[in-house]
């Protein structure tokens, strides 16, 4: 909220992620929202996925997976225009969630996959030329893969202990 409030009075575009970025911008851009709706929808996504991710993975995996997926996707797919907002964090959480659904083989898998596709289609319609698609999709994919690796290594280490 602080960064959103500041963006109402000061130009924070230098803090967004763009080509020629400084290292600290790989994290900072996630905390700057330029509109209330942007902040609102990211907050809703966070509130929806955080308890589910914590239940599925505990506290350690998200602390590892989310920063890695956010930093990797932003370093690889930054663009000429500055990128802002926590959507990359939300898409990382969605990737972790989809990984767990995939692993468990839920019958809900199709339902949630369709919901995710609707979100992506809505973004492409309403956010065309504004939203950095590549960062979102890569954060989702990277967090999905890292989550699968975390659960695989956790299962391997548990089987060796017992």
Regions found by a protein language model. Give the residues of each.
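A detector for small-residue-rich transmembrane helices and their helix-helix packing motifs
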Residues: 1-162
């Amino acid at each position: 909220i602080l960064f959103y409030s500041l963006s109402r009075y000061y130009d924070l575009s230098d803090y967004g992620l763009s080509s020629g970025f400084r290292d600290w911008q790989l994290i900072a851009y996630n905390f700057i929202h330029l509109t209330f709706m942007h902040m609102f929808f990211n907050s809703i996504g966070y509130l929806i996925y955080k308890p589910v991710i914590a239940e599925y993975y505990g506290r350690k995996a998200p602390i590892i997976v989310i920063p890695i997926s956010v930093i990797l996707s932003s370093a690889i797919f930054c663009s000429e225009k500055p990128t802002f907002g926590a959507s990359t964090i939300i898409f990382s959480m969605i990737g972790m969630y989809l990984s767990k659904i995939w692993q468990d083989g839920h019958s809900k898998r199709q339902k949630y996959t369709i919901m995710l596709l609707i979100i992506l289609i809505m973004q492409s319609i309403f956010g065309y030329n504004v939203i950095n698609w590549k960062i979102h999709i890569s954060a989702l994919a990277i967090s999905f893969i890292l989550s699968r690796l975390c659960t695989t290594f956790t299962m391997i280490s548990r089987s060796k202990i017992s």
